[in-house]
Amino acid sequence: MSASINNVINVTLLEEGRAAARDNINVCAILTSQTGVLSTAERWRSYKSASAVEQDWGASSVTAAFANVFFGTSPNPVSAGGTLIVGYWNAAGETLPATSGVLRGGEISQAVVLPALREKSDWSFSIEIDGTKHDVTEINGMTATTLADVIAQIQAKITPDVASVVFDGSRIAITNKSTGTNSVVGYPTVLDGGSFIGDLLAVAEGSGASLVNGSASTEISPETQLESLSKLKAQVNVKGAAFIDKILDAQVPLIASWAKANAVIVYETFTGSAALEVDPTNPAWAVTLASQSNFRMLYSKTGNRKFGVSYMARTHTVNFNGERTAITLHLKTMNVPAESYEQTEIDKAKRVGLDIYTTIKDVPCVLSSGANDFVDNVYNLMAYVDAVQTDSFNLLKTTPIKVPQTYYGVDQLEDCVEKTTHGFVKAGVFNPGTWTLPDFFGDRDMFLRNIEQNGYYVLAGDLKDQSTADRQERKSPVVQVAVKNAGAVHSADIIINFNK
Protein backbone atom coordinates (compact mmCIF):
# COMPACT_ATOMS: atom_id res chain seq x y z
CA MET A 1 0.00 0.00 0.00
CA SER A 2 1.12 3.59 -0.58
CA ALA A 3 2.30 5.79 2.27
CA SER A 4 -0.10 8.26 3.84
CA ILE A 5 0.17 11.88 2.79
CA ASN A 6 0.17 12.68 6.52
CA ASN A 7 3.84 11.66 6.49
CA VAL A 8 4.47 14.82 4.51
CA ILE A 9 1.62 17.26 5.01
CA ASN A 10 -0.66 17.65 8.04
CA VAL A 11 -3.57 20.08 7.92
CA THR A 12 -5.45 21.51 10.89
CA LEU A 13 -8.76 23.24 10.20
CA LEU A 14 -9.43 26.21 12.48
CA GLU A 15 -13.15 26.91 12.18
CA GLU A 16 -14.81 30.18 13.03
CA GLY A 17 -16.73 30.10 16.31
CA ARG A 18 -20.47 30.67 16.45
CA ALA A 19 -21.37 34.34 16.89
CA ALA A 20 -24.02 35.74 19.22
CA ALA A 21 -26.89 37.66 17.65
CA ARG A 22 -27.70 41.21 18.63
CA ASP A 23 -30.86 41.63 20.66
CA ASN A 24 -33.99 42.02 18.56
CA ILE A 25 -34.90 45.57 19.49
CA ASN A 26 -38.34 45.17 17.89
CA VAL A 27 -39.82 42.51 20.18
CA CYS A 28 -42.82 44.17 21.84
CA ALA A 29 -45.20 42.91 24.50
CA ILE A 30 -48.82 43.63 25.34
CA LEU A 31 -49.62 42.48 28.87
CA THR A 32 -53.16 41.31 29.48
CA SER A 33 -55.07 40.24 32.56
CA GLN A 34 -57.55 38.31 30.41
CA THR A 35 -57.76 34.70 31.54
CA GLY A 36 -58.47 31.52 29.64
CA VAL A 37 -55.45 31.35 27.33
CA LEU A 38 -52.38 32.30 29.35
CA SER A 39 -51.70 31.63 33.00
CA THR A 40 -48.84 31.57 35.46
CA ALA A 41 -47.91 28.21 33.93
CA GLU A 42 -47.73 29.67 30.39
CA ARG A 43 -46.89 33.35 30.61
CA TRP A 44 -46.55 34.34 26.96
CA ARG A 45 -47.19 33.56 23.33
CA SER A 46 -45.68 35.18 20.24
CA TYR A 47 -47.63 36.37 17.22
CA LYS A 48 -46.87 37.65 13.73
CA SER A 49 -50.44 38.50 12.69
CA ALA A 50 -53.71 39.78 14.11
CA SER A 51 -55.56 36.68 12.89
CA ALA A 52 -53.34 34.45 15.02
CA VAL A 53 -54.24 36.49 18.11
CA GLU A 54 -57.94 36.28 17.26
CA GLN A 55 -57.67 32.51 16.86
CA ASP A 56 -56.30 32.15 20.40
CA TRP A 57 -58.21 34.89 22.21
CA GLY A 58 -61.39 35.38 20.20
CA ALA A 59 -62.17 38.13 17.70
CA SER A 60 -64.25 40.11 20.21
CA SER A 61 -61.75 39.90 23.08
CA VAL A 62 -60.03 42.96 24.49
CA THR A 63 -56.64 41.33 23.83
CA ALA A 64 -57.46 40.89 20.15
CA ALA A 65 -58.68 44.50 19.97
CA PHE A 66 -55.34 45.81 21.24
CA ALA A 67 -53.45 43.43 18.94
CA ASN A 68 -55.45 44.75 15.97
CA VAL A 69 -54.22 48.25 16.79
CA PHE A 70 -50.65 46.95 17.02
CA PHE A 71 -50.71 45.15 13.68
CA GLY A 72 -52.80 47.90 12.06
CA THR A 73 -50.09 50.47 12.75
CA SER A 74 -48.01 50.96 9.62
CA PRO A 75 -45.21 50.18 9.63
CA ASN A 76 -45.15 47.93 12.70
CA PRO A 77 -42.41 45.82 14.34
CA VAL A 78 -43.14 42.73 12.25
CA SER A 79 -42.05 44.61 9.13
CA ALA A 80 -38.67 45.18 10.79
CA GLY A 81 -38.10 41.60 11.95
CA GLY A 82 -39.90 42.02 15.26
CA THR A 83 -42.82 40.21 16.81
CA LEU A 84 -45.70 40.73 19.21
CA ILE A 85 -45.60 38.99 22.56
CA VAL A 86 -48.84 38.72 24.51
CA GLY A 87 -47.84 38.39 28.16
CA TYR A 88 -49.89 37.49 31.21
CA TRP A 89 -50.56 39.64 34.26
CA ASN A 90 -52.04 37.63 37.12
CA ALA A 91 -54.13 40.53 38.36
CA ALA A 92 -56.88 38.76 40.29
CA GLY A 93 -55.12 35.65 41.51
CA GLU A 94 -55.33 32.21 40.01
CA THR A 95 -56.56 28.78 40.98
CA LEU A 96 -54.38 26.05 39.57
CA PRO A 97 -56.40 22.88 38.98
CA ALA A 98 -55.52 19.65 40.68
CA THR A 99 -53.16 17.49 38.66
CA SER A 100 -53.01 13.78 37.92
CA GLY A 101 -50.34 11.27 38.79
CA VAL A 102 -48.33 10.21 35.77
CA LEU A 103 -45.71 7.65 34.84
CA ARG A 104 -43.37 9.02 32.17
CA GLY A 105 -41.36 6.38 30.39
CA GLY A 106 -37.79 6.70 29.23
CA GLU A 107 -37.00 7.61 25.65
CA ILE A 108 -37.43 4.76 23.17
CA SER A 109 -37.16 4.28 19.41
CA GLN A 110 -39.95 2.50 17.58
CA ALA A 111 -37.41 1.17 15.07
CA VAL A 112 -35.55 -0.56 17.90
CA VAL A 113 -38.45 -1.65 20.11
CA LEU A 114 -40.91 -2.94 17.50
CA PRO A 115 -38.79 -5.86 16.19
CA ALA A 116 -38.32 -7.11 19.77
CA LEU A 117 -42.04 -6.79 20.50
CA ARG A 118 -42.87 -8.90 17.44
CA GLU A 119 -41.00 -11.86 18.88
CA LYS A 120 -43.68 -12.67 21.48
CA SER A 121 -47.44 -12.72 21.92
CA ASP A 122 -47.60 -13.04 25.72
CA TRP A 123 -46.27 -9.69 26.95
CA SER A 124 -47.53 -8.67 30.38
CA PHE A 125 -47.05 -6.51 33.47
CA SER A 126 -48.86 -5.46 36.63
CA ILE A 127 -49.34 -1.84 37.69
CA GLU A 128 -50.94 -0.12 40.68
CA ILE A 129 -53.09 2.95 40.03
CA ASP A 130 -54.50 4.70 43.09
CA GLY A 131 -53.58 1.63 45.10
CA THR A 132 -55.55 -0.75 42.89
CA LYS A 133 -53.63 -3.47 41.09
CA HIS A 134 -54.24 -3.82 37.35
CA ASP A 135 -52.91 -6.90 35.54
CA VAL A 136 -52.14 -6.37 31.87
CA THR A 137 -51.78 -9.70 30.06
CA GLU A 138 -51.76 -11.29 26.62
CA ILE A 139 -50.31 -8.30 24.78
CA ASN A 140 -49.65 -9.68 21.30
CA GLY A 141 -46.63 -8.03 19.74
CA MET A 142 -46.43 -10.45 16.82
CA THR A 143 -49.38 -8.82 15.06
CA ALA A 144 -48.25 -5.24 15.67
CA THR A 145 -47.38 -3.13 12.63
CA THR A 146 -46.55 -0.06 14.71
CA LEU A 147 -45.94 0.67 18.36
CA ALA A 148 -49.37 2.29 18.43
CA ASP A 149 -50.90 -1.18 18.02
CA VAL A 150 -49.24 -2.33 21.24
CA ILE A 151 -50.26 0.86 23.07
CA ALA A 152 -53.87 0.30 21.98
CA GLN A 153 -53.82 -3.19 23.49
CA ILE A 154 -52.44 -1.85 26.78
CA GLN A 155 -55.08 0.90 26.80
CA ALA A 156 -57.81 -1.71 26.31
CA LYS A 157 -56.56 -3.57 29.40
CA ILE A 158 -56.19 -0.37 31.46
CA THR A 159 -59.53 1.18 30.57
CA PRO A 160 -59.61 4.91 29.70
CA ASP A 161 -61.72 5.68 32.77
CA VAL A 162 -58.77 4.49 34.91
CA ALA A 163 -55.79 5.97 33.03
CA SER A 164 -54.70 7.05 29.57
CA VAL A 165 -51.80 5.35 27.81
CA VAL A 166 -50.09 7.49 25.15
CA PHE A 167 -46.95 7.24 23.03
CA ASP A 168 -45.81 10.72 21.94
CA GLY A 169 -43.22 9.53 19.45
CA SER A 170 -40.36 9.21 21.90
CA ARG A 171 -41.76 7.99 25.23
CA ILE A 172 -44.83 6.38 26.79
CA ALA A 173 -46.93 8.16 29.41
CA ILE A 174 -49.53 6.52 31.66
CA THR A 175 -51.68 9.28 33.18
CA ASN A 176 -54.14 8.69 36.01
CA LYS A 177 -57.69 9.91 35.37
CA SER A 178 -58.10 10.93 39.00
CA THR A 179 -56.60 14.16 40.33
CA GLY A 180 -55.30 15.46 43.64
CA THR A 181 -52.74 14.29 46.15
CA ASN A 182 -54.11 10.75 46.12
CA SER A 183 -53.65 10.41 42.36
CA VAL A 184 -50.76 7.95 42.06
CA VAL A 185 -49.37 5.68 39.33
CA GLY A 186 -46.80 3.03 40.23
CA TYR A 187 -44.03 1.38 38.23
CA PRO A 188 -44.99 -1.76 36.28
CA THR A 189 -43.89 -4.97 37.97
CA VAL A 190 -43.37 -8.55 36.79
CA LEU A 191 -46.52 -10.63 36.61
CA ASP A 192 -46.50 -14.39 37.05
CA GLY A 193 -46.93 -15.81 33.59
CA GLY A 194 -46.12 -14.05 30.37
CA SER A 195 -43.08 -12.01 29.35
CA PHE A 196 -42.42 -8.75 31.19
CA ILE A 197 -42.73 -5.79 28.81
CA GLY A 198 -41.83 -3.00 31.26
CA ASP A 199 -38.11 -2.83 30.51
CA LEU A 200 -38.58 -3.01 26.75
CA LEU A 201 -41.03 -0.08 26.79
CA ALA A 202 -38.81 1.80 29.30
CA VAL A 203 -41.62 2.19 31.84
CA ALA A 204 -40.19 -0.07 34.55
CA GLU A 205 -38.22 1.25 37.51
CA GLY A 206 -34.59 1.74 36.56
CA SER A 207 -35.33 1.95 32.83
CA GLY A 208 -35.32 5.74 32.68
CA ALA A 209 -38.96 6.14 33.69
CA SER A 210 -40.10 8.62 36.33
CA LEU A 211 -43.14 9.06 38.55
CA VAL A 212 -44.95 12.31 39.30
CA ASN A 213 -47.71 12.17 41.89
CA GLY A 214 -50.83 14.29 41.53
CA SER A 215 -51.23 17.56 43.40
CA ALA A 216 -54.16 19.35 44.95
CA SER A 217 -55.71 22.50 43.57
CA THR A 218 -53.49 25.49 44.43
CA GLU A 219 -54.38 29.14 45.02
CA ILE A 220 -51.88 31.64 43.59
CA SER A 221 -51.99 35.15 44.99
CA PRO A 222 -52.37 38.15 42.67
CA GLU A 223 -49.15 39.76 41.47
CA THR A 224 -48.23 43.37 40.88
CA GLN A 225 -47.74 44.75 37.40
CA LEU A 226 -44.03 45.06 38.10
CA GLU A 227 -43.87 41.39 39.08
CA SER A 228 -45.61 40.36 35.87
CA LEU A 229 -43.17 42.43 33.79
CA SER A 230 -40.19 40.97 35.60
CA LYS A 231 -41.42 37.40 35.14
CA LEU A 232 -42.13 37.99 31.46
CA LYS A 233 -38.69 39.54 30.88
CA ALA A 234 -37.07 36.50 32.54
CA GLN A 235 -38.66 34.26 29.91
CA VAL A 236 -38.52 36.35 26.73
CA ASN A 237 -36.27 39.29 25.87
CA VAL A 238 -38.90 41.95 25.21
CA LYS A 239 -37.70 45.47 24.42
CA GLY A 240 -41.03 47.29 24.49
CA ALA A 241 -44.04 46.71 26.74
CA ALA A 242 -47.50 48.16 27.32
CA PHE A 243 -50.32 47.10 29.63
CA ILE A 244 -53.91 46.81 28.47
CA ASP A 245 -54.94 47.79 32.00
CA LYS A 246 -53.94 51.11 33.52
CA ILE A 247 -50.65 51.01 35.42
CA LEU A 248 -51.51 51.85 39.01
CA ASP A 249 -50.07 55.14 40.28
CA ALA A 250 -48.10 53.35 43.00
CA GLN A 251 -46.55 51.06 40.37
CA VAL A 252 -45.47 53.86 38.00
CA PRO A 253 -42.21 54.85 39.78
CA LEU A 254 -41.31 51.20 40.39
CA ILE A 255 -41.86 50.18 36.77
CA ALA A 256 -40.11 53.31 35.49
CA SER A 257 -37.03 52.46 37.54
CA TRP A 258 -37.18 48.80 36.48
CA ALA A 259 -37.46 49.72 32.80
CA LYS A 260 -34.25 51.76 32.91
CA ALA A 261 -32.36 49.01 34.72
CA ASN A 262 -33.54 46.24 32.38
CA ALA A 263 -33.24 47.99 28.99
CA VAL A 264 -36.97 47.85 28.29
CA ILE A 265 -39.12 50.75 27.07
CA VAL A 266 -42.49 50.76 28.85
CA TYR A 267 -45.34 52.75 27.29
CA GLU A 268 -48.16 54.14 29.45
CA THR A 269 -51.14 56.32 28.54
CA PHE A 270 -52.29 58.80 31.18
CA THR A 271 -55.64 60.55 31.32
CA GLY A 272 -57.39 63.15 33.48
CA SER A 273 -56.47 66.78 34.10
CA ALA A 274 -54.28 65.90 37.10
CA ALA A 275 -51.78 64.18 34.79
CA LEU A 276 -51.10 67.56 33.12
CA GLU A 277 -50.09 69.30 36.32
CA VAL A 278 -46.56 70.05 37.52
CA ASP A 279 -47.14 68.45 40.89
CA PRO A 280 -44.96 65.94 42.79
CA THR A 281 -48.09 63.86 43.42
CA ASN A 282 -48.57 63.50 39.67
CA PRO A 283 -46.81 60.19 38.80
CA ALA A 284 -46.08 61.39 35.26
CA TRP A 285 -44.30 64.52 36.48
CA ALA A 286 -42.43 62.44 39.08
CA VAL A 287 -41.07 60.21 36.28
CA THR A 288 -39.85 63.27 34.38
CA LEU A 289 -38.20 64.69 37.49
CA ALA A 290 -36.38 61.38 37.95
CA SER A 291 -35.21 61.37 34.28
CA GLN A 292 -36.56 57.84 33.87
CA SER A 293 -36.63 58.09 30.10
CA ASN A 294 -37.31 54.37 29.47
CA PHE A 295 -40.83 54.99 30.78
CA ARG A 296 -42.61 56.66 27.87
CA MET A 297 -45.63 58.72 28.84
CA LEU A 298 -48.54 59.52 26.57
CA TYR A 299 -51.74 61.44 27.22
CA SER A 300 -55.25 60.76 25.97
CA LYS A 301 -58.10 63.03 26.97
CA THR A 302 -60.57 60.22 26.29
CA GLY A 303 -58.50 57.60 28.10
CA ASN A 304 -57.76 55.63 24.91
CA ARG A 305 -55.16 53.13 26.10
CA LYS A 306 -54.70 51.79 22.59
CA PHE A 307 -52.72 54.96 21.85
CA GLY A 308 -49.80 53.53 23.85
CA VAL A 309 -49.88 50.26 21.89
CA SER A 310 -49.91 52.00 18.51
CA TYR A 311 -47.15 54.38 19.64
CA MET A 312 -45.04 51.41 20.74
CA ALA A 313 -45.70 49.60 17.46
CA ARG A 314 -44.61 52.62 15.42
CA THR A 315 -41.47 53.17 17.51
CA HIS A 316 -40.02 49.66 17.20
CA THR A 317 -39.73 49.62 13.41
CA VAL A 318 -36.11 50.54 12.68
CA ASN A 319 -33.70 48.20 10.91
CA PHE A 320 -30.35 49.59 12.02
CA ASN A 321 -28.56 47.66 9.26
CA GLY A 322 -30.11 49.95 6.67
CA GLU A 323 -29.20 53.43 5.48
CA ARG A 324 -31.05 56.46 6.89
CA THR A 325 -33.57 54.24 8.65
CA ALA A 326 -33.68 56.02 12.04
CA ILE A 327 -36.96 57.77 12.83
CA THR A 328 -38.64 60.24 15.15
CA LEU A 329 -42.19 59.76 16.46
CA HIS A 330 -42.94 63.47 16.18
CA LEU A 331 -45.78 64.15 13.69
CA LYS A 332 -46.17 60.43 12.92
CA THR A 333 -49.58 58.84 12.29
CA MET A 334 -51.03 56.34 14.76
CA ASN A 335 -53.73 53.70 14.34
CA VAL A 336 -56.09 55.39 16.82
CA PRO A 337 -58.45 58.39 16.56
CA ALA A 338 -56.79 61.79 17.00
CA GLU A 339 -58.13 64.04 19.75
CA SER A 340 -58.79 67.77 20.05
CA TYR A 341 -56.71 69.79 22.53
CA GLU A 342 -56.64 73.39 23.67
CA GLN A 343 -53.30 75.17 23.49
CA THR A 344 -53.09 75.24 27.28
CA GLU A 345 -53.41 71.45 27.38
CA ILE A 346 -50.74 71.10 24.69
CA ASP A 347 -48.35 73.34 26.63
CA LYS A 348 -48.98 71.49 29.89
CA ALA A 349 -48.46 68.09 28.29
CA LYS A 350 -45.20 69.25 26.74
CA ARG A 351 -43.90 70.54 30.07
CA VAL A 352 -44.80 67.39 32.00
CA GLY A 353 -43.31 65.10 29.34
CA LEU A 354 -46.46 63.69 27.76
CA ASP A 355 -46.84 63.01 24.04
CA ILE A 356 -50.31 63.60 22.60
CA TYR A 357 -52.11 62.64 19.39
CA THR A 358 -54.05 65.46 17.80
CA THR A 359 -54.59 67.16 14.45
CA ILE A 360 -52.89 70.04 12.68
CA LYS A 361 -54.87 71.41 9.73
CA ASP A 362 -57.07 68.31 9.95
CA VAL A 363 -54.05 66.00 9.64
CA PRO A 364 -53.58 63.58 12.59
CA CYS A 365 -50.11 63.62 14.14
CA VAL A 366 -48.14 63.01 17.32
CA LEU A 367 -46.82 66.03 19.20
CA SER A 368 -43.73 64.91 21.11
CA SER A 369 -42.39 66.31 24.34
CA GLY A 370 -38.69 66.16 25.08
CA ALA A 371 -39.08 66.92 28.77
CA ASN A 372 -38.26 63.28 29.57
CA ASP A 373 -36.08 62.93 26.44
CA PHE A 374 -37.42 61.75 23.11
CA VAL A 375 -38.33 58.10 22.61
CA ASP A 376 -36.08 57.74 19.55
CA ASN A 377 -33.03 58.70 21.62
CA VAL A 378 -33.85 55.99 24.16
CA TYR A 379 -34.62 53.40 21.49
CA ASN A 380 -31.56 54.20 19.36
CA LEU A 381 -29.08 54.18 22.24
CA MET A 382 -30.52 50.94 23.59
CA ALA A 383 -29.88 49.33 20.20
CA TYR A 384 -26.41 50.88 19.88
CA VAL A 385 -25.17 49.80 23.30
CA ASP A 386 -26.29 46.23 22.66
CA ALA A 387 -24.68 46.25 19.20
CA VAL A 388 -21.31 47.43 20.55
CA GLN A 389 -21.40 44.88 23.36
CA THR A 390 -22.45 41.98 21.11
CA ASP A 391 -20.08 42.78 18.25
CA SER A 392 -17.13 43.16 20.63
CA PHE A 393 -18.01 39.84 22.26
CA ASN A 394 -18.17 38.19 18.84
CA LEU A 395 -14.69 39.48 18.00
CA LEU A 396 -13.31 37.54 20.97
CA LYS A 397 -15.66 34.58 20.54
CA THR A 398 -15.39 33.76 16.84
CA THR A 399 -11.61 33.76 16.47
CA PRO A 400 -10.25 30.18 16.36
CA ILE A 401 -7.04 31.43 17.99
CA LYS A 402 -7.10 34.59 20.12
CA VAL A 403 -7.09 38.36 20.08
CA PRO A 404 -3.62 39.02 21.49
CA GLN A 405 -3.01 41.40 24.37
CA THR A 406 -0.84 43.55 22.10
CA TYR A 407 -1.21 46.76 20.13
CA TYR A 408 -2.44 44.69 17.20
CA GLY A 409 -5.09 42.99 19.36
CA VAL A 410 -6.29 46.24 20.91
CA ASP A 411 -6.49 47.76 17.43
CA GLN A 412 -8.78 44.89 16.43
CA LEU A 413 -11.13 45.73 19.29
CA GLU A 414 -10.97 49.43 18.45
CA ASP A 415 -11.72 48.71 14.79
CA CYS A 416 -14.67 46.53 15.78
CA VAL A 417 -16.25 49.34 17.81
CA GLU A 418 -15.62 51.80 14.98
CA LYS A 419 -17.29 49.50 12.45
CA THR A 420 -20.38 49.12 14.64
CA THR A 421 -20.57 52.85 15.29
CA HIS A 422 -20.22 53.64 11.60
CA GLY A 423 -23.25 51.43 10.95
CA PHE A 424 -25.31 53.65 13.24
CA VAL A 425 -24.02 56.73 11.42
CA LYS A 426 -25.19 55.11 8.19
CA ALA A 427 -28.60 54.42 9.76
CA GLY A 428 -28.95 58.09 10.72
CA VAL A 429 -28.61 57.72 14.48
CA PHE A 430 -25.29 59.60 14.66
CA ASN A 431 -23.91 62.17 12.27
CA PRO A 432 -20.88 64.44 11.81
CA GLY A 433 -21.29 67.69 13.67
CA THR A 434 -19.88 70.09 16.23
CA TRP A 435 -19.09 68.72 19.69
CA THR A 436 -20.81 71.04 22.19
CA LEU A 437 -19.74 69.45 25.47
CA PRO A 438 -16.60 70.55 27.33
CA ASP A 439 -15.61 66.90 27.82
CA PHE A 440 -13.17 65.16 25.52
CA PHE A 441 -10.48 62.45 25.65
CA GLY A 442 -7.19 61.91 23.86
CA ASP A 443 -5.82 64.68 21.69
CA ARG A 444 -8.44 67.45 21.66
CA ASP A 445 -7.88 68.49 18.04
CA MET A 446 -8.06 64.90 16.83
CA PHE A 447 -11.15 64.33 18.96
CA LEU A 448 -13.00 67.33 17.51
CA ARG A 449 -11.87 66.59 13.96
CA ASN A 450 -13.20 63.02 14.12
CA ILE A 451 -16.55 64.19 15.49
CA GLU A 452 -16.84 66.83 12.76
CA GLN A 453 -15.82 64.46 9.97
CA ASN A 454 -17.19 61.09 11.10
CA GLY A 455 -19.73 61.76 13.83
CA TYR A 456 -17.79 59.62 16.31
CA TYR A 457 -14.38 59.09 17.86
CA VAL A 458 -13.03 55.82 19.25
CA LEU A 459 -9.86 55.65 21.32
CA ALA A 460 -8.29 52.70 23.14
CA GLY A 461 -5.96 53.23 26.06
CA ASP A 462 -2.24 52.58 25.74
CA LEU A 463 -0.99 49.15 26.77
CA LYS A 464 2.07 50.69 28.43
CA ASP A 465 -0.22 52.53 30.86
CA GLN A 466 -2.04 49.34 31.87
CA SER A 467 -1.72 48.11 35.45
CA THR A 468 -0.04 44.80 36.20
CA ALA A 469 -3.27 43.47 37.69
CA ASP A 470 -5.26 44.23 34.52
CA ARG A 471 -2.49 42.75 32.41
CA GLN A 472 -2.56 39.53 34.43
CA GLU A 473 -6.37 39.45 34.22
CA ARG A 474 -6.01 39.68 30.43
CA LYS A 475 -8.12 42.81 30.19
CA SER A 476 -7.98 45.16 27.25
CA PRO A 477 -7.19 48.80 27.87
CA VAL A 478 -10.36 50.87 28.17
CA VAL A 479 -11.99 51.74 24.85
CA GLN A 480 -13.70 55.14 24.90
CA VAL A 481 -16.32 56.23 22.39
CA ALA A 482 -17.83 59.64 21.69
CA VAL A 483 -20.81 59.92 19.34
CA LYS A 484 -22.67 62.92 17.95
CA ASN A 485 -26.43 62.49 17.91
CA ALA A 486 -28.07 63.20 14.56
CA GLY A 487 -31.25 64.39 16.29
CA ALA A 488 -34.32 65.37 14.30
CA VAL A 489 -35.96 68.64 13.24
CA HIS A 490 -39.27 68.94 15.12
CA SER A 491 -40.04 72.61 14.47
CA ALA A 492 -38.72 75.67 12.65
CA ASP A 493 -38.95 79.46 12.67
CA ILE A 494 -39.15 81.01 9.22
CA ILE A 495 -38.59 84.71 8.55
CA ILE A 496 -39.89 86.21 5.34
CA ASN A 497 -38.58 89.56 4.16
CA PHE A 498 -41.09 91.19 1.86
CA ASN A 499 -40.16 93.98 -0.49
CA LYS A 500 -42.97 95.85 -2.20
Model-found features: residue ranges?
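Polar low-complexity, Ser/Thr/Gly/Ala/Asp/Asn-rich disordered segments used for subunit assembly
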Residues: 1-29, 34-123, 129-130, 139-305, ...
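Structured, hydrophobic secondary-structure cores that serve as assembly/anchoring elements
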Residues: 1-64, 68, 75-81, 367-500
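Short glycine-rich loop/turn motifs
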Residues: 122-124, 478-479
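Short strand-coil-strand connectors
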Residues: 128-132, 486
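Short, isolated positions in well-ordered beta-strands
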Residues: 134-136
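Short, surface-exposed charged micro-motifs
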Residues: 162-164, 348, 355, 480
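A glycine- and small-residue-enriched flexible loop/hinge signal that marks low-structured segments
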Residues: 229-401, 413, 432-456
